[in-house]
């Protein structure tokens, strides 16, 4: 028999069962997607889209449905917070059901093709020999893929026949599903511009349709056909793996660095938004604008959306996860309940002090307070006997603006220190750690898991491409033949069915 790593060679000269294997694989993928969607719906809590969004709950397939326009449930809730809605058939449950039904039909098709493997379709009508016209099949597949790509861009995304896609502002506050017009100018190449997604699907679809028709109608030159081994099914495998690993690298990048197709409302913020103080700068800009228009500090900070403040918290940074830390973010720091408000620290001279924030890759970080010039004015010392900047010595107090503790000031050092320790993580929130038995160790968001998985798959598939590409290009070199072997062990197509001695020609 064959060793376990060579079992797929039984499909090399057997188009019928190659189709069956692919149908079964698609059935498994569609079945997984539908089942996973139902599992996530069973565990998803839609009650607080601001402080307990899907990405905090570790949802993996829901955000992908939402970005394509599915936002409602047959239970009447929507991910944007509405209740009592009627989403029609294309709800989360409807999509899950469609995938499970598709999976069942594909399973039956796989069984049929496994039993009826020897079809007239796979034989050359001129010779009666088994033969596949691979260049023509490539053209047909390219044409169909181009048609799908064009249809998705021109109809689904534009809203002409479909819902559009998830569109939001740069700070992930006002997202919703909207029809999107294509952006044909240079701004279409901005990865954060949804119009570019539409334009590129339309353009790529047209190119795919034209290229597909070309490959259906035009035969490859003989020298090129032989040089690229176009008659060998392993060439198809090698080039297909190349396409897939390239796509996996691309989506790992767009997910980790962020793009219009990976909105932060659905997948959580990127690590670079914490690293660059992206949300902190926007919050400060809004506060300064409010103060300039005559608002008090309390009013200015109370106007900051809780959603924006929550993004400015290190626990939502996907780089704060870790290997083997399974589970959703809520299993780490807990389920966020409320924003405590913005903490402002001052020393006994009344000078405002700023807590230095923890960089992404630190697990622990000292509590250091600096003035506006970056000069250290207070800290929580490791060795109290030698301290000069302790909270007690510097008379540090904390006042809260906005949030639950709006307008309150605390002066007792233990309380002030407890808030300073929390302030190194960004804005301060109250968490429920009991419901999920949260352990206090940060987890990554679906953004981190998706990136990690696709980077790993891409690397593995890259080696698969090299392996199968080398095998198809150098097959004659690799398969050096022992002259003592009998013809049936050597000759391709000696048996009509591989390994079946009853089908000898």
Swiss-Prot record:
UniProt: chlorophyll a 16 binding residues: 465
KW Transmembrane helix (keyword) present: yes
Annotated positions binding chlorophyll a 9: 201
Binding site for chlorophyll a 13: 215
Residues annotated as transmembrane: 20-35, 100-114, 139-155, 202-217, 236-251, 456-471
A single GO cellular-component term on record: plasma membrane-derived thylakoid membrane
Amino-acid positions noted as binding chlorophyll a 14 in the UniProt annotation, renumbered to this chain: 200
GO biological process terms held by the UniProt record: photosynthetic electron transport in photosystem II
Tagged with keyword Protein transport: no
Cofactor note: Binds multiple chlorophylls. PSII binds additional chlorophylls, carotenoids and specific lipids.
Membrane protein topology class: Multi-pass membrane protein
Residues that coordinate or bind chlorophyll a 5: 141
GO terms for MF: chlorophyll binding; electron transporter, transferring electrons within the cyclic electron transport pathway of photosynthesis activity; metal ion binding
Xref: InterPro entries: PS_antenna-like, PS_II_antenna-like_sf, PSII_PsbB
Subunit structure, interactors included: PSII is composed of 1 copy each of membrane proteins PsbA, PsbB, PsbC, PsbD, PsbE, PsbF, PsbH, PsbI, PsbJ, PsbK, PsbL, PsbM, PsbT, PsbX, PsbY, PsbZ, Psb30/Ycf12, peripheral proteins PsbO, CyanoQ (PsbQ), PsbU, PsbV and a large number of cofactors. It forms dimeric complexes.
Protein name per Swiss-Prot or TrEMBL: Photosystem II CP47 reaction center protein
Native species: Thermostichus vulcanus
Gene: psbB
């Amino acid at each position: 028999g064959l060793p376990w790593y060579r079992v797929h060679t039984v499909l090399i000269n057997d188009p019928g069962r190659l189709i069956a294997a692919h149908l079964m694989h698609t059935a498994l993928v569609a079945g997984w997607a539908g089942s996973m969607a139902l599992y996530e719906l069973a565990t998803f809590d839609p009650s607080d889209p601001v402080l307990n969004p899907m990405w905090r709950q570790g949802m993996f397939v829901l955000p992908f449905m939402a970005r394509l326009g599915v936002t409602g449930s047959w239970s009447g809730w929507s991910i944007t917070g509405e209740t009592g809605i009627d989403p029609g058939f294309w709800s989360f449950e409807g999509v899950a059901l469609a995938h499970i039904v598709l999976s069942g039909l594909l399973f039956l098709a796989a069984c049929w093709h496994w039993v009826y493997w020897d079809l007239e379709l796979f034989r050359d009508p001129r010779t009666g020999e088994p033969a596949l016209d691979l260049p023509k099949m490539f053209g047909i597949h390219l044409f169909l893929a181009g048609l799908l790509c064009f249809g998705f861009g021109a109809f689904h995304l534009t809203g002409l026949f479909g819902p559009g896609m998830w569109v939001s502002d740069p700070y992930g506050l006002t997202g919703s599903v909207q029809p999107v017009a294509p952006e044909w100018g240079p701004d279409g190449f901005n990865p954060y511009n949804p119009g570019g997604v539409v334009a590129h699907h339309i353009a790529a679809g047209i190119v795919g349709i034209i290229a597909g028709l070309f490959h259906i109608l035009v035969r490859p030159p003989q020298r090129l056909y032989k040089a690229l081994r176009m008659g060998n099914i392993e060439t198809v495998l090698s080039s297909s793996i190349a396409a897939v690993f390239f796509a996996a690298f691309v989506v790992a990048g767009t997910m980790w660095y962020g793009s219009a197709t990976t909105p932060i409302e659905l997948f959580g913020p990127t690590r670079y938004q914490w690293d660059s103080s992206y949300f902190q700068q926007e919050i400060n800009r809004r506060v300064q604008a409010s103060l300039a228009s005559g608002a008090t500090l309390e009013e200015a900070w109370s106007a900051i959306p809780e959603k924006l403040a929550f993004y400015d918290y290190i626990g939502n940074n996907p780089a704060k996860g870790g290997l083997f830390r399974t589970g959703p973010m809520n299993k780490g720091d807990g389920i966020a309940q409320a924003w405590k408000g913005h903490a402002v620290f001052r020393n006994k001279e009344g000078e405002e002090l700023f807590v230095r924030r923890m960089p992404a890759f630190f697990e622990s970080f000292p509590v250091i307070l600096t003035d506006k010039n970056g000069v250290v004015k207070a800290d929580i010392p490791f060795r109290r006997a030698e301290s000069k900047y302790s909270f007690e010595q510097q008379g540090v107090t904390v006042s809260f603006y906005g949030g639950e503790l709006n307008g309150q000031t605390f002066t007792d050092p233990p309380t002030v220190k407890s808030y300073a320790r929390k302030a190194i993580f960004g804005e301060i929130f109250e968490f429920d750690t009991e419901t999920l038995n949260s352990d206090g160790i940060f987890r990554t968001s679906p953004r981190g898991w998706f990136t990690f998985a696709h980077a790993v798959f891409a690397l593995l598939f890259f080696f698969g491409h090299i392996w199968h590409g080398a095998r198809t290009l150098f097959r004659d070199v690799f398969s050096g033949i022992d002259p003592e072997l009998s013809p049936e062990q050597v000759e391709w197509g000696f048996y009509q069915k591989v390994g079946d001695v009853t089908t000898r020609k």
